[in-house]
Each structure stands twice: as structure tokens, then as C-alpha cells.
Regions:
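N-terminal presequence-like segments and the immediate start of the first folded domain
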Residues: 1-86, 91-305
Length: 305
């Protein structure tokens, strides 16, 4: 529940079959989990940080992505096998003395990491969220199925411009010197995993954005409602089918993670969410989001059938 301080935990369950084999592995000081069966491998890697927290956000981002790349290479999994990514960015909307915004520096580093990769099923689902300290930290869920038994598809939302297609108008700060211009946030609005007649969908961090513009000046209740409407349309039966997922109904949302910028808005946001989803497990955290005018961001997981 919302509290002024303390620890909150979210637990994800993975159902294993008789064919699945699970291993806990290490690469240097990085622990990770592999679930594998013939023709299919899944990787869970979390808490990847840089070695030097006083380095710039740009330097830390490049280092963290380099460490992730080494794990993927060790496991024989391409960068494009990443289906979900959680990106925790210290003081996400802050700018340094040279005019570089933390979030933009991270996005430029991510673009360079993704460069040259064939994203045939779309970019990963992702959340980019602020922290008070800690530099850059990334969690990754990757899936590689060579036997064709599982389909992985990016899901777009017609209510919003794809984040990776944003114009320069909504990108702040200075660009990376290695790039011709500032680069966009490389993620899909959702990522679906489908097998035979069922699956699940990772809903990316979603906010009160229509097109590429934030909904400003309306207060936390309206931003929360608009965010939920964006998610509901995203995982609707019609939109899933439009994205190539043969779901027969809307995705059933099974969990939310709610990021609220201001403590005084926490209870108001909770009331809007619980009124619409009274039985849905949700955790609430006090944290900054990727635009200064946005007051809330919500991510989730849904079940497909």
C-alpha cells in the first residue's frame, strides 16, 4: 500500500512445464536466471548498474548496456530477444551543467545499443522511471524461441504516437556527440507473447499522452483516468487483433504498478484506479516520471486468450 517510505515488492510467477529446465547463473558479479527447453530460452536479469555512480548518466548508461550485452552474448541471445525492459534513471528529468537531460542521455545510449539490430517484432515493452539516486539501473526479460512455437509481437496504440516515432519537439536537452540528433525512446506501447491459444502482454509504462502531447493542467484524477483509458484501448480485443494477435477477447489485466510524482496525489490516484479496478493487485510508488508535466505513469501485465 502507499506509504511515505519503506519497501514494496512485486512478485512475478512463471509456470514451468516438464520440459523446462531452470538454472541460476553468474557472469562476473551479475546473477541471472535461465529457463530453457529445446528450441526456447528465457532470461531474467535484474539490477544491472554501472561500477561508478558519480559518472554521468550518459557514461553509466553505456556501461550498463555493455554489461547486458555481455550476458546476452554469453547465452547466445540477440539484443532483439529482449521483450521487456525496466529502466530506472536518477533524477530522470534533470539536466546537467552542459544542458544534457538525464532521460535524453539515457535514450541516446539505448538507441546506440539497439542500433544495427533487426527488430522484426518491434522494440521491447519498457518503463523509464525516475529515482532519487542510484544512477542507472536496468532489469531485462528476454525470450528466444527458435522452434516457432511462440510468437512475440509489438502492440501499438492508435491513441498515441509510437514513442520511437516522436518528433524532436518533445525531446529535451542536448544530443549525444555520436549522434546526428536527439533520439527517441525506443520501446513499444506493449509487447505480446502468444502460444497456440493463449499468452500474456507486457504493458509499457503508460501516461496521459495523446498523440505525442501530454495532457496538461487537468489534475491527477483526469491524468489517471486518461492513462487507464490508454491502457484499456491498448489491450482491447480489436487493437490486439489489429496488431496480429489472435486474441478472442480483451486482455485480462492481472497487475498494475503505479508511479505517482507527488505524495499529495497518491490517494487521489489510488481512488481512481481502485474505482475502475477494485480487485486488481496494484502497487503504488512515489517517484518521478519521464516528463515534468506528467503526474502519473502506470504499467501492467495482462493475460491473453
Amino acid at each position: 500500500p502507499p506509504q511515505s517510505m519503506g519497501l514494496v515488492m512485486e512478485v512475478h510467477e512463471v509456470q514451468l512445464t516438464e520440459q523446462d529446465h531452470i538454472e541460476y547463473r553468474m557472469l562476473g558479479d551479475l546473477p541471472y536466471i535461465i529457463i530453457e527447453r529445446e528450441g526456447c530460452k528465457r532470461l531474467f536479469l535484474s539490477g544491472v548498474t554501472g561500477d561508478v555512480l558519480h559518472q554521468s548518466i550518459r557514461e553509466q548508461s553505456h556501461e550498463v548496456f555493455s554489461r547486458i550485452a555481455k550476458v546476452l552474448e554469453t547465452e547466445g541471445m540477440p539484443v532483439s530477444s529482449i521483450i521487456r525492459q525496466w529502466n530506472y534513471i536518477e533524477k530522470i528529468t534533470a539536466c546537467d551543467a552542459t544542458g544534457h537531460q538525464h532521460y535524453q542521455d539515457f535514450n541516446d545510449a539505448r538507441s546506440l545499443f539497439y542500433n544495427g539490430v533487426e527488430w522484426t517484432t518491434g522494440y521491447p515493452a519498457a518503463t523509464g522511471i525516475g529515482t532519487q539516486w542510484g544512477g542507472i539501473m536496468i532489469d531485462v526479460d528476454a525470450l528466444l524461441c527458435k522452434d516457432g512455437s511462440v510468437r512475440v509481437l509489438g502492440v501499438d496504440n492508435p491513441l498515441q504516437i509510437a514513442a520511437h516515432a516522436y518528433s524532436q519537439n518533445v525531446l529535451l536537452g542536448e544530443k549525444d556527440v555520436a549522434l546526428p540528433q536527439k533520439t527517441t525512446p525506443k520501446f513499444e506501447r506493449a509487447k505480446a507473447v502468444w502460444k497456440e491459444d493463449h499468452g500474456f502482454v507486457y504493458v509499457s509504462g503508460t501516461a496521459a499522452i495523446r498523440g505525442e502531447q501530454s495532457l496538461e493542467g487537468v489534475g491527477i484524477e483526469q491524468q489517471t483516468l486518461t492513462t487507464l483509458e490508454n491502457i484499456e484501448y491498448l489491450v482491447s480485443h480489436d487493437n490486439l487483433n489489429r496488431s496480429g494477435i489472435p486474441a478472442t477477447e480483451n486482455a485480462t489485466l492481472i497487475t498494475f504498478r503505479v508511479y505517482v510524482k507527488r505524495w499529495e496525489d497518491m490517494e487521489k490516484a489510488r481512488q481512481v484506479v481502485t474505482e475502475r479496478y477494485p480487485d486488481l493487485p496494484a502497487i503504488y510508488t512515489l517517484t518521478d516520471v519521464c516528463r515534468s508535466e506528467l503526474l502519473i505513469e502506470i504499467e501492467g501485465i495482462g493475460v491473453l486468450c
